[in-house]
Every structure is written in C-alpha cells, then in structure tokens.
Amino acid sequence: MKKLSFLIATALCIMACSGGSDEQPDGPGNGNGNGGGGSTPNPVSFSNPIVGKQLPDPTIIHAADGNFYLYVTQQDNIYIPIYKSTNMTQWTYAGAAFLQKPNWQPDTRLWAPDINYINGKYVLYYTLGHWDLPKNSCIGVAVSDSPVGPFTDHGKLLDYNSGTMQCIDACYFEDNGKKYLFWGSYNSTSKGYEGGIRYVELSADGLSIKGAVSEKIAGPSIEGIMVHKRGNYYYLFGSTGSCCEEERSTYRVVVGRSKNIEGPYVGKNGTVMKENSSYNEVILQGNNLFAGTGHNSEIITDDEGNDWFFYHAWQKAKIDNGR
C-alpha cells in the first residue's frame, strides 16, 4: 500500500495524511473506498490540523466537477455541513446537505455521513443517532444531483432489527458489480445491547436493501468502519476506544485484511476481527499533541497521485475547538 499521510481538524477536528509527507506522525474517485495507487505521487506540504474546528466523522468525495467535498456530523442546526477544496488542505464552507433534518426518527441527531457517487447521483448514507438510547439509532439514505445538495431524503434503510442494536456509521462499498453497506458499533452491557459490525447487499441504485439477511463481519469493539481495496486485498479499518472524552479519549484506528470482501479480516498478528477487533493492527493513535484519533474517511487520491486519509481528533492544546 502506498504510504499515507494524515489530516486533522482539532478536538472533534479533522486531520489528514497524504502520501507525500514523512513528517506527519498522525497519520477517487467515487467515495467508495476503492481505488488509488496510481503513479508516483508528488509530495504535498501541509500541517495538522488542516481544519481547526468541530468537524467529527469525516467523509470525502472527489466530485465530477474536479473539486473535493467533505461532509461531517451535524453541528448545531447545520444538518451535515459540507466543505469544499481544490487541494485537500484548504477548505471552505459550502453549505448543508439538508435544509431540514429528516424527521422520520424523532429525538435524534445526524451523525457520521458517508458520501458516494452511484449511477450519476450523489448518494449520502447517514445515521439518525441517539447517544443514550441506541435502539433508537437508524441509518437512512438521501440523493442529490449536486455534491452540495440539497439532498432529497429517501428514508430509513436499517434499524435495530438489522442484527445489531447500534445501527450507526454506514460505509458503502461496491465490488464486482455488487453494492454493499457495512455498519455497526460497540456492545454495551450497561445499556443492554449487543454490537458488532455487519454488512448487507444493496439494490442496484443503492437506495434499498436487496433482501438478504445481514452478516456479521467484525466483533463489537470497533465502529466508524471503512472498507478499501488495494491490489488483491480488502482492508477493513475501524476505530476502537473512547471517542468523546476530550484529552482522555483513547480512540485509535485498527485494520485487518482479507482476500474476500466477506472476510475473514485478519491483522498482522493473526487476530481475526470477527472475534476480537480491538486487538488488530493499530495504524493510528494519539500522541502528545492529539487524542482520540479516529473515525477515518475513505482513502482518496488527489490529482497529483497522493493518497489522503482523513480523521478527527482532539487537539490537546485547544480542547475547546472540539474534534
């Protein structure tokens, strides 16, 4: 895999990694996590955080107009903020995905978007999440002709009946003509629900479940997963630890790989992710500057051939900025 470099925003902020920088310790297409690995990249100069404000759970797409678009979790009454860039390092606010929050699941917030380009449309998967009542969390889907929306909501795709009580953090992936959705999160014995990462095949337009029963692919100790194919391997990235305890956050990114999209995904140490995901290969963790490094985006390749890997983190010196 080509060397990556990272992008941060602070404390609920976004950070990045790109293939051209050896000095970033913190670590195209269609937003599908499938691609990259082009010719020798031209180095990029940047420093983290690249966006120093509250922008958790990033997802990014290289759009048909040549620009890059970044989408993040709801901020106040901005229902999935969208940012635009020509170079992956300088971002400007471009609007919100929704003018009004989808109202089919009350008392929830818009979390963890996942942007994709499917059949000539921009397709946005999103979570309507409830922190204290995970049974109320659901995944929906919306569509737009433009990367900046507004997106038309197509309603609920998945809820707790899908096989995991924590129905959050969707990740779309297309492979060999089939479309898949991955999702899930932790167990919580104190709240009485079972977690885990599951996947299911989608319809041709990506807007409904094809009908197959969902399958478990990773254990209940990771969330914010992302699937990427490079060469003959599929890579399953996920975040484990605590996300939201400011400088005490232990969020970190782990990864396993498989020769089949259905798994099993295995880390370098031989740990099978379906059994114990949190003990897989750690590729990104906090340091003396940042804590809670996780919920990474797709791997995106820029026009110069550099691979970028975006994630959020708490900047210890500026905790009030968020992650």
What are these regions (language model features)?
Residues 18-323:
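Carbohydrate-active catalytic/glycan-binding domains of CAZyme proteins
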Residues 7-15:
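Bacterial N-terminal signal peptides
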